[in-house]
C-alpha cells in the first residue's frame, strides 16, 4: 500500500485505528492486493456518490465502484459513512473490512438491510426528557447497536423539561440487562463536552442516533463548539421535530474524536435473532437452563425463565418485550422466504 500523502497521523485524526500501517490481518491482505492505492474514510454518502477524507476538513469527492451503482447490488455491501476504502486517484477501488456496524431493516415492507454507519466505537442514543421519552424504544436502539459490536450510551436531553431526571434514569436501568451508561445533559450548554468526554477520546468514533426533535443537531453543535448543524422546531403536541439532518456525515471534534450525525429514524426493525442476544443476555442465559432445549417459556415444566419470573428476578414486562421483538424478527424472516418462492 502506498504511504498516505498526509501521513498516518492525519488518518488517526479521522479515526484510523493504528499509529501506522494496519495491524489487522484482513486489512493487511486487502492492502497488499491493492498495493498502489491509499486509504481514506467515507465522511458523506449521497445518491450521486461519496465524499471521503484523508485528513480532517479536507473532503474529496470520489467515484464509487461501478458495481455499487447497479440496483441489483446488495446495499449492505456498498460503503457507508464511517467505512474505510482504498483509493486510486479519485476513485474507490476497494472496501476495507468493517470492525463494527449498525444496521437495520429498511423502513417499509421490503426485507432489505440498511447500514446506518460503520467502524464505530460508541453510539449515543439521544432522547429528550419530554414527550419523546420512551424506554421501550431506547431498548430497541440498544438491541440494534449492541448486535453490531458497538457500545450504546443513552444521552438524555431537555433536562429542563423533566421534573425528576433521576426517576427517568432509574426506569431506563430497569429496562436494561446490562450496565447501561446513561448521561443526562442540557445539550445547549457546554456541560455535554465534559459529561461525554470518556467516549470522545482522540481516535474514537461516535454516532448520534435518535428520533427527530430529540436534540441531536443541538448536541452536535455543542460538541463541535460552533453552529454548524441546522436546528429545527419541535411540535408541542407530540414532541416530534422535522428532519434537520438530511444525510449522514462524519465530523471531526475538537476533542480528537469523530462524530457521525444521522437523520432521525422512525422505524427500528431488526435483521436477525442474533440482534437480541446482547441486550437480552439474561433471558438467553436462563433459556440454557430450561429442561427442554425447545422450551417456549410459556407453561413447560422445568422452564428456568418462568421460574425467574416466579421468584422475582426477571421482570415479566421484559420477557413480554423479548417475545415481541423476537416475533418481529421471525415474521420478517418468514416474509423474506416467501418472496424467494
From Swiss-Prot:
Monomer. Associates with 30S ribosomal subunit, binds 16S rRNA. Zn(2+) binds at residues 290, 295, 297, 303. Its EC number is 3.6.1.-. One of several proteins that assist in the late maturation steps of the functional core of the 30S ribosomal subunit. Helps release RbfA from mature subunits. May play a role in the assembly of ribosomal proteins into the subunit. Circularly permuted GTPase that catalyzes slow GTP hydrolysis, GTPase activity is stimulated by the 30S ribosomal subunit. It comes from Xylella fastidiosa (strain Temecula1 / ATCC 700964). GTP binds at residues 157-160, 210-218. This is Small ribosomal subunit biogenesis GTPase RsgA. InterPro entries: G_CP_dom, P-loop_NTPase, Ribosome_biogen_GTPase_RsgA, RsgA_GTPase_dom. It is found in: Cytoplasm. Its main location: cytoplasm. CDD domains: YjeQ_EngC.
